[in-house]
Amino acid sequence: MKKLFSYKLSFFVLAVILFWAKTYLSYKTEFNLGVKGTTQEILLIFNPFSSAVFFLGLALLAKGRKSAIIMLIIDFLMTFVLYANILFYRFFDDFLTFPNIKQSGNVGNMGDGIFSIMAGHDIFYFLDIIILIAVLIWRPELKEYKMKKRFASLVILSGIALFFINLHYAEKDRPQLLTRTFDRNYIVKYLGLYNYTIYDGVQTAQTETQRAYASSDDLTSVENYTTSHYAKPNAEYFGSAKGKNIIKIHLESFQSFLIDYKLNGEEVTPFLNKLAHGGEDVTYFDNFFHQTGQGKTSDAELTMDNSIFGLPEGSAFVTKGENTYQSLPAILDQKEGYTSAVLHGDYKSFWNRDQIYKHIGYDKFFDASTYDMSDENVINMGLKDKPFFTESIPKLESLKQPFYAHLITLTNHYPFNLDEKDASLKKATTGDNTVDSYFQTARYLDEALEQFFKELKEAGLYDNSVIMIYGDHNGISENHNRAMKEILGKEITDYQNAQNQRVPLMIRVPGKKGGVNHTYGGEIDVMPTLLHLEGIDSQKYINFGTDLFSKDHDDTVAFRNGDFVTPKYTSVDNIIYDTKTGEKLKANEETKNLKTRVNQQLSLSDSVLYKDLLRFHKLNDFKAVDPSDYHYGKEKEIK
């Protein structure tokens, strides 16, 4: 037993230690994983160890020298995965995915430049293999020893156990890590590069399977639905924004109850209140709801730019990032010659934006790397809203007009922290820190927005621009109902929670008078609304929403979980309420038909995403977006 440990097991232990060391060092030196806090650092140290024990432990099932050779082969394959990601990250500032490998638009674009991003110190990543080969040559006695399969199985099971311990603490630090899949960086940071590769492979296989069995016949029911639900444009508004810039402003986690709300007698959002009452000739939709699922912000982006719902689980931005889309920026480009851009104070890989934006057809993506991310400018998820808006002005000025620009704010994001010097409003006093802090960050966002309007005017961009402002999703979850009862002065029942899913939608169209519009609608309706304002008929495109200004608008608002709201009925968990009074009602033929329609709408939208059906939807005057035509940031710098 002593010799067994000395030779065979010591070779395994040496392989594990060397492999762990090079992987951990690569995490620290090659990748920008954004590790924060002790827990994340411990997990970063731990995750290469669990991977090494499991994968290298598989070789222990073989006998003698063959075991060591298999261990070397496994080590080499894992090193290949590591080094391929290192090179890819140096070029694209992102991790490899299986779709990347198949796409010439990403890996192929590296071309001869791959040699320019190799470095002399890269030999370090193969040093452990050289050491292990030397040990194998100089210690031939390895071939004499056999290990019991029971012991080898115990090692492998230990690797699996270590992974689940890793996963437990990762999920504790970042809930819904795998179901929502925020960012490839997060998966690598928490679970490791090798587990990320497996995860990506499984996700890709699932997507490819669904896609492989789809055909153009599957699109027929979708086309029938969208054709029958088409709402023709309102002549008063159709084409009223033609040729004008569109500036779409995303208010992070902003709910409509903040509009006109006073905290201790003081308005929380005085500028937005002014806009909501027709200031700057803004039209305010006060019965507008978010329709996001687990994908939250990414679902809102997807829905508003494509008029399709996010998925029932996870984020379509991540899992369906390679799909074909008939998006608003692509249509505006091909029909009216618009330049499109996203401006955001977070890094581009979050929510897989750097990949899916290429499939949506955004010409430019200004992420955190293009802004001043010094400590005084950053809080919570990224860049503070005031410097974000100020620094965005020259970026907007650089765009060829007309442009469609999407600006995504961040400061009003959970946990709603704010530096004391930036706070102009005292916190609420419910005792729930999340709710109490929410009002401070909402006020800061309101001030930043007012500043942005002034800066747009000073830059000469205001007069010729449609400005759309929207809240992406709720900021306060049901976990805070006690505090919200105190804030709103009413019990937060299931009915009231559904009403609380209202988020603001404000649209300023130059030359059109503003005011309050009581139409019921949701994020699914934004794309056809903007198309009609631009004078582009939405009828031939696959839209699950309808124009908010149309007299034929469908005012049934479907939530991602199958609940719904109309001006007359609210349905939560199949219980029907009167929308105006909250009184419980008995289900009737009308509510049953509404439920059937909502389920059909969600199901058909899911089918479009799961089966990538828009690749079959051919239009004479619309060309499918080619992602290889788009390049963002760092990947263009290497020649």
From Swiss-Prot:
Pathway field: Cell wall biogenesis; lipoteichoic acid biosynthesis
Metal-binding as UniProt keyword: yes
GO cellular component term of the entry, any: membrane
Keyword Transmembrane in annotation: yes
Extracellular topological domain residue ranges: 25-41, 89-116, 172-639
Assigned EC number: 2.7.8.-
Signal sequence coordinates: none
Bilayer topology annotation: Multi-pass membrane protein
Post-translational modification: Proteolytically cleaved by the type I signal peptidases SipT and SipV.
Description of what induces expression: Transcribed under partial control of SigM ECF sigma factor.
Alphabetic keyword roster: Cell membrane, Cell wall biogenesis/degradation, Manganese, Membrane, Metal-binding, Secreted, Transferase, Transmembrane, Transmembrane helix
Any GO MF annotation of the entry: metal ion binding
Chain segments annotated as transmembrane: 4-24, 42-62, 68-88, 117-137, 151-171
Binding site for substrate: 413
InterPro entries linked to this entry: Alkaline_phosphatase_core_sf, LtaS-like, OpgB/LTA_synthase_biosynth, Sulfatase_N
Active site per the UniProt annotation: 297
EC supergroup of this enzyme: transferase
Short name of any one Pfam family annotated for the protein: Sulfatase
Purpose: Catalyzes the polymerization of lipoteichoic acid (LTA) polyglycerol phosphate, a reaction that presumably uses phosphatidylglycerol (PG) as substrate.
Protein family according to the UniProt entry: Belongs to the LTA synthase family.
Miscellaneous: Could not restore staphylococcal growth after ltaS depletion.
Name under which the protein is recorded: Lipoteichoic acid synthase 1
